[in-house]
A protein has these predicted regions:
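Pair of pore-lining "gating" transmembrane helices in MFS-fold secondary transporters
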Residues: 13-34, 114
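Juxtamembrane intracellular "pre-TM" segments in multi-pass secondary transporters
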Residues: 1-20, 204-205
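Intracellular juxtamembrane helix-capping segments at the cytosolic ends
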Residues: 122-135
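Structural signature of the two symmetry-related core transmembrane helices
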Residues: 84-99
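Short amphipathic helix-loop junctions that connect adjacent transmembrane helices
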Residues: 36-53
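Paired small-residue
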Residues: 96, 107-115
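Helix-to-loop junctions at the C-terminal end of transmembrane segments
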Residues: 68-81, 166
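Residue-level signature of mid-helix packing/kink "hotspots" within the transmembrane helices
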Residues: 63-71, 155-156
Length: 205
């Protein structure tokens, strides 16, 4: 059995592999960046009663839409190419966060958070499918475990990023900063996928 280093060296598209790991981290960062400030932001939008319950519903809205649409997004990725779907989903997610900064009521924020979950439902299957295609069969479990490491790292960094932005710039800039992160990852992946934009599949060969 190959060592982890030998496995990584055997993968031809190492740059794309790193890009997918970083995208997994970004997915969690953009999903979790508003978690620390959400109850405060919901209160600033005018919610006084059942503040924690309403905040919880807004957080859950993303998970509900991801659950509803992830299967459909997986089929769409098979049809148009998972690398293309990743790019579209990152653009979509960044735009949704800009709209979240403009929300006037908790209801609007909840609807936008629900719509954001559709993008998450596209990102996660897309990354998994691409990793599966780029990785030798004997190394899939290890590569997926490394990908999970980056995903969980995003869950740590996202709330820290959101809290830091809030402390220095206020509520709205948490959303703008998160949108900027999504757009930055989009540009990075556009560079990595530049040779594959006209084809449907990205494969190891």
């Amino acid at each position: 059995q190959k060592s982890s280093w030998q496995l990584l060296m055997s993968i031809q598209q190492k740059d794309i592999l790193l890009g997918l790991f970083l995208t997994s981290m970004t997915i969690q960062m953009i999903a979790q960046s508003i978690s620390p400030i959400l109850p405060l932001y919901v209160r600033a939008l005018g919610q006084r009663d059942n503040l924690i319950f309403v905040s919880g519903m807004i957080v859950s809205a993303m998970g509900v839409s991801s659950m509803l649409f992830s299967g459909w997004m997986g089929k769409l990725g098979d049809r148009i190419g998972n690398h293309r779907l990743l790019l579209i989903a990152l653009l979509y997610s960044g735009c949704l966060y800009i709209l979240c900064a403009q929300a006037q009521t908790p209801l609007q924020l909840g609807i936008l958070r629900f719509l954001f979950g559709i993008g998450t439902g596209a990102l996660l299957p897309g990354v998994s499918a691409l990793l599966n295609r780029l990785t030798p069969p004997e190394g899939i479990s290890r590569i997926f475990s490394y990908n999970q490491l980056f995903y969980y790292l995003g869950g740590v960094l996202g709330p820290m990023m959101g809290s830091s932005i809030f402390m220095h710039f206020g509520y709205h800039w948490v959303f703008y900063g998160t949108a900027l992160l999504a757009f930055t990852d989009l540009i990075f992946l556009l560079f990595l996928f530049r040779k594959y934009l006209k084809v449907r599949d990205v494969r190891a060969n």
